[in-house]
Amino acid sequence: MMPTLVASMVSDGLNRFSKSVRDSRILIMGVAYKKNVSDCRESPALDVMRLLTDKGAKLSYNDPFVPSLRLGTSILQSIEATPAEIAKHDCVIILTDHSAYDVRQIVASAKLVIDTRNSTKDLHEHKERIIKLGAGNNVPSFSTHDDSHDIAKKKAASH
């Protein structure tokens, strides 16, 4: 995940609702480095949070494994991610796909969801609220398939 790309996706998503990042309420779901752990050292979530804070966003976060964290000079506390709390935010960003997250409930409660973990792949409702990283949203797709061989074959065949 590239933090600048995620921040750009948030900006583009909010623009759909005629909102800017400045003064928007953004909820980060998951700040840990990976799923179901408490370690957030070197987590890309921290860079995403810094970028959005620098753009004037009002950030909150939820992480069942990280009850508090330092962001710059501030200490943030994990908030409870109830449907009512989620609905208060202009955008929800799924940065770590903890097993405890009810993705269906998150999407149903949110106005806009930026899904960086493909955790909404099985949802069929509220798709208009979801922007997925690498899912044809004019952003790079991070595939595990190495298609460089396919490209080389096509080039060789065309000559």
How would you label these PLM feature ranges?
Residues 1-159:
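Structural/interface elements that position substrates and couple domains in central-metabolism enzymes
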